[in-house]
A protein has these predicted regions:
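C-terminal accessory nucleic-acid interaction domains of nucleic acid-metabolism proteins
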Residues: 1-44, 54, 58, 119-139, ...
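SsDNA-processing nucleotidyl-transfer enzymes
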Residues: 2-16, 35, 43, 47-148, ...
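Flexible loop/turn segments at secondary-structure boundaries
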Residues: 28, 71-74, 84, 150, ...
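Short beta-strand
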Residues: 64-67, 173-179, 220-224
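Short glycine-rich loop/turn motifs
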Residues: 137-139, 172, 182
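Secondary-structure boundary elements
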Residues: 164-172, 211-212
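Short, conserved phosphate-binding/catalytic loop or strand-edge motifs used
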Residues: 177-187
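Catalytic palm subdomain of template-directed nucleic-acid polymerases
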Residues: 186-199
Length: 378
């Protein structure tokens, strides 16, 4: 028997689009009241914050984190856009650290977002670069990841120091909740720099913040060195490393979302304040509180100068990349400090090769298709 569906007409700058929503009554969020956590509610949520979510995704290659069986079920990270898609869906081609390529979704309007939500996409993970030049990021992202033993107050405090550090450098930061445990601070930059340069700048910023509040913040890559502190994850600026976009829904029973904030709101903000139920009325009242981000372009040169000063005055050079990356120029031994040595170097190299091979297989091996009605089981 064919799955039930509804057809939604969506206004876009290119004209009306029709988005098919299959199984609209399917429960996606068990922590919400009846009639609030269905698949149709997820899709309509994205329509309600259209201007904001599109601002964060516009012209960016985007990875889809799909939960076709609901928020508490298995996740699928989909880098390649499905072949079975409407003709109006736009795409972008990107290159991975392995040298392989993929064609990813490239949202240009809310119809793209709603179409992906019908596939079970909860959160959207865009590249920090645009389709016109995928090799040059136009966004510096600071990911504040709280380690066990830290509190939400700690995360907010660290975010405030990130803002201070950016201000000292003549840069403007925009803060949002992750929708999960942490906070993100975004800076628009000119697309003139490579991923290597922008990542290195993120590392320098993380180290600067950690030096200002060493008991609360760390930029140490190895978990054994982080302690009970907030980790500033500089590797989120490495190629093909992404984080959930503004207004993305997270895989939690309560359907929390990644909420853009005004800095004045941060001291009182809680992750649980922002859900697919509470965000639409907030958006209707305030609009997108990050509406000015595209016009607030910060210079990256002060951070690049900080990189040079840290190297010259403190001997702080490169730091480890994620395991799926090949050995990078200037990178130290990619092995935990507690097991460092010649044997560890060989193990680290072997682990990196294995991780890269696994990542390539994951990207190129198609997932077995679910029975569908032409769109999605989700």
């Amino acid at each position: 028997m064919p799955s039930p569906f509804v057809l939604l007409e969506v206004d876009t700058p290119s004209g009306p689009r029709e988005v098919k929503v299959t199984n609209p009554e399917k429960t996606y969020f068990s922590g919400l009241a009846a009639g609030q956590g269905r698949k149709i509610d997820l899709v309509e949520y994205y329509r309600s914050v259209a201007q904001g979510v599109v601002r964060g995704l516009f012209e960016r290659p985007t990875v889809l984190k799909r939960h076709p069986d609901g928020a508490e079920a298995e996740a699928i990270y989909q880098k390649r856009v499905p072949e079975n898609r409407p003709g109006w869906i736009e795409t972008a081609t990107v290159r991975f650290p392995s040298g392989r390529h993929a064609t990813e979704l490239c949202p240009v309007d809310v119809a793209h977002v709603m179409w992906a939500a019908n596939l079970g996409t909860l959160d959207f993970h865009p590249w920090p670069s645009r389709r016109s030049d995928t090799e040059s990021p136009d966004e510096l992202r600071v990911d504040l990841d709280p380690m066990p033993g830290t509190t939400w107050d700690d995360v907010r405090t660290v975010a405030g120091v990130v803002r201070e550090a950016l201000t000292d450098l003549g840069m403007s930061g925009f803060v949002k909740t992750s929708g999960s445990k942490g906070l993100h601070v975004y800076c628009r930059i000119e697309p003139r720099w490579t991923f290597t340069q922008v990542r290195r700048s993120a590392l320098a910023l993380g180290r600067d913040v950690a030096q200002r509040i060493p008991d609360l913040a760390t930029a140490a890559w190895w978990k054994e060195e982080r302690g009970e502190r907030v980790f500033l994850d500089y590797n989120r600026m490495a190629r093909d490393q992404t984080i959930a976009s503004a207004y993305s829904v997270r895989a939690r029973a309560a359907a929390t979302v990644s909420a853009p904030l005004l800095w004045a709101e941060l001291p009182d903000a809680e992750i649980e304040d922002f859900t697919i139920v509470t965000m639409p009325p907030r958006f209707a009242e305030l609009g997108d509180v990050h509406a000015g981000i595209d016009e607030s372009v910060s210079p990256l040169e002060p951070l690049l100068e900080l990189v040079e000063r840290q190297e010259r005055d403190q001997g702080l050079g490169e730091a480890a990349y994620p395991p799926q990356f090949p050995k990078m120029e200037g990178e130290p031994l990619r092995s935990r400090p507690s097991v460092a040595g010649p044997a560890a170097e060989k193990r680290a190299a072997a682990d990196a090769r294995a991780a890269e091979a696994d990542a390539d297989r994951a990207r190129t091996s198609p997932r077995p298709r679910r029975p569908t009605t032409g769109e999605s089981k989700g």
